[in-house]
Amino acid sequence: MSFNLEDTLESDWVAVRPNVFEEKERRKFVFIVAWNEVEGKFAITCHNRTAQRQRSADKAGGRSPARQQQRDSPAQSPARKAREEPEEGEEEECSWAGLFSFQDLRAVHQQLCSVSSELEPCLPTFPEEPSGVWSVLFGPSELSEAEVEDLGRQLRLYLGHALDTSGWKILSQVLFADSDDPEEYYQSLSELRHKGYEEGLQRARKRLQELLEKHKTTEVMVDLLDLYQLEDEAYSNVVEATTELYQYLLQPFRDMRELAMLRRQQIKISIENDYLGPRRIESLKKEDADWQKKAHMAVLSIQDLTVKYFEITARAQKAVFDRMRGDQKKFGKTAWAAAVERVEKLQYGVAKETLQLMRAKEICLEQKKHALKDQMQSLQGGTEAIAVLDELEADYYDHQLQLYEVQFEILKCEELLLTAQLESIKRQISEKTDEVVYYDTYESMEAMLATEDMAASIHIQRVELQKLQQKVRQLEAKRGRISAKKAYLRNKKEICIAKHSEKIQQRLHSDEGYRAAQLKQEKQEDEEERKSTWVSQERQKTLDRLRTFKQRHPGQVVLKSTRLRFSHERRRSTIRTTSSTDAPQSLSVSIQTQGLSDLGDTEVLQPIKTQKPETTTQLEDSSLPPNAITSELPLMTSLPTFTHEKLEPEISTLQPSSLPASPPPPPPPLPPPPPPPLPPSKQDTDTLEIRVIHVKKETEEKDGAKPVSGPLAQLFDSSQLLNARKTLKKTGALEGIQRRRVSSPMDEVLASLKRGSFHLKKVEQRALPPFPDEDESNNILAQIRKGVKLKKVQKEALRESFTLLPDTDPLTRSIHEALRRIKEASPESEDEEESLPCTDWEN
C-alpha cells in the first residue's frame, strides 16, 4: 500500500488492525447446550472456568482475617486503592447465554467458515424448518428426545472445535456480541502511515547493522572499500527514513504553531481596529492567552522531536565511524591511505551531527529554565510557597548544570570540527609540498623560469599554499577562542556549584536553627509548666498548713483595727521629728582643684544634712564652678592658699565653735600630686605664647548678691568665693603653660579635644602653575579639580531599581533572593558570549 496517496483517495481505504483477534493467554471454556421447547430453539450457555476459579480463589482469600485486615489497613497507599477499585468494578464476565434456531446456527456456521474452512463439514445436520404458509398451518416439526440429545451433543462438539480453530474472540463476537464497535477492529490511516514510517526506519537500520557486521570477516582493502560505499548508501537511507518519520511527526505541531500565531495576529488586529466592549476585549485576551499557550506547547514538542531526530542520526554516524576506526588497526599506513579521506569526512560528520544534537538540547534546557523562572515569579502566597520556591530553585540549578555540560560539549564538538579541518588542510599542504613534478630539460634554471607557462604554474602553487596556510592560522585562532570559552564555562560552572552548595548549607543551618529554637521554646514551656506546677503545689501546701493551724488553734487570731494603726504611726512620727530638731546642724563642703584637662568642669558643694534645701541650692549657684569632685570632710573647709612655687592646693581646717565636737568618719585619700615640671629655658620663655581659653560660665550676679541664711552664711563670704575662683583660674592657666612646655603636639591636640575647643588656622589655597607643554586633558589633577559630569537617570530606570527593592513579604523577598542567586550562577548574558571575536567557521 502506498503512503503518498491524497486525502481524497485515502477516504476510500480502510485499514484493519493487525493481530486484532490474537489472544494473550489460553482460557478454558465449557459449552452447555439444551433444547428449549417453549421457544423451539437451542439454549447455548458458555462458562469461563478460568475466570470462575480466580474469582472463587479471590473470595476465599478475601474471607481470611489476615487478608481482610491487610485490605482494610489505613496504611495502604491511596494510589493502590484507586488502582484496585476499577479492577474490582470491571470484573471479567464468566458466563454467556443465548437462544439459537436452526437458521441462526447455519448463519453462524457460514461466518465461522469464512474465517476457517476446516469447519465446513463439522456442522451437524439440522431438520428442515417449514417456511411460508406451511409453517403457519402445520407448525414446526416435533423432534424426539433422542434426536434432541444427539443434536445437542453434536452441537457441543462443533462449538468446541470452532473454539480451537477460530479462537475465543471471533467465536464470542459471532455468538454473543450485541453490537460491533468498528474502532476495535479498524485503524486510522494516520496511525497506519506512522507505523509504515517506523517500519521503514527499522528496515534501514537493520540493513546498516548487517553491513557493519560484515567488517569482521573482511580482510582485503578492496572489498572493504566496496563495503564502505554500501555503508554510505545504507546510512543515507537511515537518514532519509528518519527524516520522513520525524517530518510526519512534526507536521501537526507546525500546523498548530502557525495556526496559533495566525489567530493571535487576528485577535490583535481586532482589538486595535474594532470598536469592542470591555467584555469582548477581555474574552479576546483570554483567547489570545490560550493560543499563546498552545503555540508554546507546540514549540516544546517540536524541540523534543528535533532532539530525538539528531540522537538517531548521530548514533548511526558514530557507529559507522567507530567501525572504521577499528578497521584502521588491521591495515598498514600505505594501504590505509586510500581510506584517509573517508575517515576525515566521517569525523567531520560525527562532530557536526553531535553539535546539532547538543544545540537542540541547549534550546530545550533554555526553555525549561525560562519556564522555571516564570513559575518562580508567578508564585502566590501560601503555606507551602517557600518549599515550592526552594524546589524550583533546586530544579533550576540542576538544569543550569546540565546546560553547562551541554555547552561544554558544544565547544568540544566545535573544536573537533576545527581539528578535522586543520588535519585535512595540513594533509593537503603536505601533499602539495611533497608532490613530485617532472619538467622538460633546460640548460639552466633561468631558462626554465623564462617560459610563461612554467612561471604561471609555480606562481599558482605558491598562491594556493599561501591560502591554505592563512586558513590554518585562522582555524588556529578560532581554536584558541574556543579554549578561552571553555575556561569561562568551567569557571561559571564552579560558581554555580558553589552557589548551590551555599544554598544547601544555608538551608541546613536554617533547619538546624529552627530545630534549636523549637527545642529551646519547648524547654522554656516545660520549665514554665514545671514552675507553675511547683507554685500551685506550694500554694496548696500553704493552704493546707493554714487550714490545719486554724483547726488546731481556733479563736486565737487577734487583728488590730485601722484606727489603732493610724494612732501608732502618728506617735512614731512625732518622736522622730523631736529627735531631728534636737540634733545639731552641720554642713561640710569640699573644694578640689582640677588640672587643665578638667578646667571646664564644674565644682559642686554638697551638704550632708540640711533643713532648708532652697538655701543650699542658692549657695551652690553662687559658689565655685559646678561638676567638681566632692568628698565629705569631717570639719569645715576654708579657702586654699596658692603660691607660684607650689601648684598643689593646700587645705586648711577651720573649726568654728558652733560645730559639734564628735569627730565624723575620716575623709578619703587625696589623689597623688603631679610630677614637678622641668625648668624652662630662656628661649622657650621668650618665644612662649600663652593662650588663655575663656570658658563661658553661666553665673548669675543676683544669686551671688543674695544673702545666705542660716549657718551657711557664717561659713563663706562672697569676697572669699571670688578670690578662690580667681586663684583657681590662675592655677589652671599656669599649670597649662607648664604642660605645654613638656608635651608633644599630639598631647595638645588631645587636650584641646578634652576641652572641646579647636584652633584652626586658615590656609590660603595655592594654585599650581600649569606646565607649559602639557595639555589640560592629560593632567589628572586638573581633571579632578574640574569634577565629573553626572548623567541624568531616566525615570524608567529609577522605577525598575525601586521595583527590585526588598519587599516586606517573606515570599517576595525569597523570590528576589532566588532570582539574584540564579543570575549570579547563570552566564551574564548571551551577548557577552557573542561579543567574543569569533566568526562562524566555513563548511
Curated annotation (Swiss-Prot):
Region (Disordered): 49-91, 518-537, 558-632, 652-688, 821-843
GO terms for biological process, alphabetical: 'de novo' actin filament nucleation; actin polymerization-dependent cell motility; Arp2/3 complex-mediated actin nucleation; cellular response to starvation; DNA repair
Keywords assigned: Actin-binding, Coiled coil, Cytoplasm, Cytoplasmic vesicle, Cytoskeleton, DNA damage, DNA repair, Lipoprotein, Membrane, Nucleus
Parts forming coiled coils: 190-225, 359-385, 416-487
Bias (Acidic residues): 827-843
GO molecular function terms noted in the UniProt entry: actin binding; microtubule binding
Keyword Lipoprotein attributed: yes
One Pfam assignment: JMY
Biased composition (Pro residues): 661-680
Membrane topology label: Lipid-anchor
Residue stretches of biased makeup (Polar residues): 66-76, 582-596, 613-630
Classification via InterPro entries: JMY/WHAMM, JMY/WHAMM_N, WH2_dom
Bias-annotated ranges (Basic residues): 562-574
Cellular localisation: Nucleus; Cytoplasmic vesicle; Cytoplasm, Cytoskeleton; Endomembrane system
One GO CC term, this protein: cell leading edge
PROSITE patterns referenced in this protein's UniProt entry, alphabetically: WH2
Residue stretches making up the WH2 domain: 776-793
Similarity-based family: Belongs to the JMY family.
Function: Acts both as a nuclear p53/TP53-cofactor and a cytoplasmic regulator of actin dynamics depending on conditions. In nucleus, acts as a cofactor that increases p53/TP53 response. Increases p53/TP53-dependent transcription and apoptosis, suggesting an important role in p53/TP53 stress response such as DNA damage. In cytoplasm, acts as a nucleation-promoting factor for both branched and unbranched actin filaments. Activates the Arp2/3 complex to induce branched actin filament networks. Also catalyzes actin polymerization in the absence of Arp2/3, creating unbranched filaments.
Name the UniProt record assigns to this protein: Junction-mediating and -regulatory protein
Species whose genome carries this gene: Xenopus tropicalis
Lineage, broadest ranks: Eukaryota, Metazoa, Chordata, Craniata, Vertebrata
